């Protein structure tokens, strides 16, 4: 039997508000959550049966500049973070912002092996961005895997044709940035 080991587990999220259309799924495990960050914190707490040991939330008037970091301690160290946007007057934080913020705040160093687990629909884009940011800039080896659609429960309705088209667009934009 093989075992996966990790020096840390990090939940990456955003400060995007939870939509009413998502409540039927999110209320099953995070009834009072208001952001993706809250959802990720509740998920980590439930899955790993842990409590926060420290939390820092940097609030600003512009929601796109807000960032948050929750620490859970233990081994492996568990962290949840939400990054601020690098262009807060234009947009909320994107995947690249989040990878850069994680690299900066968690002192990830260089040359690490990183496994990213995400929804299947997001694998191509997140892998490209991880290679571009974490691989090319910091020498990390990155592998991105996606869990099956059926694991998404009530959230599988967010995987419509429009969602796939948006992801295809994002993949093409990310590929262009690699050139």
Question: Model-found features: residue ranges?
Answer:
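A structural signal for short, hydrophobic/glycine-enriched beta-strand patches
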Residues: 1-159
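Long, compositionally biased charged/polar accessory segments in the mid-to-C-terminal portions
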Residues: 154-179
């Amino acid at each position: 039997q093989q075992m996966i080991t990790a020096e840390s587990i990090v939940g990456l999220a955003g400060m995007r508000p939870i939509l009413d259309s998502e409540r039927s799924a999110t209320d099953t495990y995070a009834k009072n959550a208001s952001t993706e960050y809250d959802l990720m914190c509740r998920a980590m707490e439930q899955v790993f049966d842990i409590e926060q040991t420290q939390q820092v939330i940097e609030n600003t008037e512009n929601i796109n500049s807000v960032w948050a970091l929750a620490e859970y301690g233990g081994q492996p160290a568990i962290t949840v973070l939400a990054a601020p946007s690098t262009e807060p007057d234009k947009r909320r934080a994107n995947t690249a912002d989040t990878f850069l913020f994680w690299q900066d705040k968690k002192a990830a160093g260089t040359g690490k092996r990183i496994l990213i687990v995400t929804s299947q629909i997001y694998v191509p884009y997140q892998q490209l961005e991880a290679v571009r940011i974490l691989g090319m800039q910091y020498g990390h080896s990155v592998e991105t895997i996606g869990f099956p659609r059926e694991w998404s429960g009530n959230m599988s309705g967010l995987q419509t044709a429009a969602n796939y088209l948006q992801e295809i667009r994002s993949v093409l934009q990310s590929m262009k940035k690699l050139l």
